[in-house]
Amino acid sequence: MTNAVTVKNITFQEGETLICVPLIGKTLDEILGNAHGLVDAGADIIEWRVDHFTQVRDMTQVMAALAEIRGALKALPLLFTFRSKKEGGETEISDEAYFALNREAARSGLVDVIDIELFNDEAQIHALVDDAHAAGVKVIMSNHDFHKTPAQEDIIYRLRRMQDLGADLPKIAVMPQSPQDVLTLLAATLTMKEKYATRPLITMSMGKSGGVSRVTGRLFGSAMTFGTVGQASAPGQIAIAKLREVMDILS
């Protein structure tokens, strides 16, 4: 049995799958326009993909934007994510800037969760996790493979490593090249949940063929899925209204 993780007014727990919707925009005006459209969309949590923001290298501008986003989203929980170029993001920044950006967001009092990518310097990961937790911010630790689906054992190893590094919510997203790859991701998720997980997991198989993994989290053990209102942030994301309908049918 995994321990539940509560973020504001939502709880990540076994047998439940929450819906996260990405907030994307290049300019502050575009971001805020999109943010207002998300408030009543039915999402459980919003992910600001700050790597799409053209001024992401200017910490002052990022924090100013974050304050306005926080106001626009009202009580909705907010996940702050800079997705690196190597894992499918829009912008490349230095490792130093990556950790500084996430640390500033965690300490700002404006975000509820930050995303830290697994494949980084472990000492820096440990320090950032500690800083986030000290600020009362939860940590999603993530890995994204946009080219393939690793072996089941490798998926499980990465999720367990995230747990060891202090993640509140380990996350992995992989790209299937065959139906068997989708089954590999689902089997890895179920095995992780039943044998090794001490906290909720987030897993998905991307692209159209991986869509089944986005709606069966309650069965296999993924505690969050990603839906869209407008622009998707990853291949295979489903419009939130359709996503919730299918999830309700399957539950």
UniProtKB/Swiss-Prot annotation:
- GO terms (BP aspect): 3,4-dihydroxybenzoate biosynthetic process; amino acid biosynthetic process; aromatic amino acid family biosynthetic process; chorismate biosynthetic process
Quote the catalytic activity from the record. Answer: 3-dehydroquinate = 3-dehydroshikimate + H2O
Pathway assignment reads: Metabolic intermediate biosynthesis; chorismate biosynthesis; chorismate from D-erythrose 4-phosphate and phosphoenolpyruvate: step 3/7
Molecular function terms in GO for this entry?
A: 3-dehydroquinate dehydratase activity
Q: Where does 3-dehydroquinate bind?
A: E47, W48, R49, R83, R214, S233, Q237
EC number(s): the record gives: 4.2.1.10
Task: Please indicate if the UniProt record lists Lyase as a keyword.
Answer: yes
- Per UniProt, which keywords does this protein have? Amino-acid biosynthesis, Aromatic amino acid biosynthesis, Lyase, Schiff base
What top-level class of enzyme does the UniProt entry assign? lyase
Report the leader peptide range.
none
So where's the catalytic machinery, residue-wise? H144, K171
Please give the PANTHER family that the UniProt record associates with this protein: 3-DEHYDROQUINATE DEHYDRATASE (PTHR43699:SF1)
Tell me the protein family, please.
Belongs to the type-I 3-dehydroquinase family.
Purpose of the protein: Involved in the third step of the chorismate pathway, which leads to the biosynthesis of aromatic amino acids. Catalyzes the cis-dehydration of 3-dehydroquinate (DHQ) and introduces the first double bond of the aromatic ring to yield 3-dehydroshikimate.
The protein's name: 3-dehydroquinate dehydratase
Annotated source species: Klebsiella pneumoniae (strain 342)
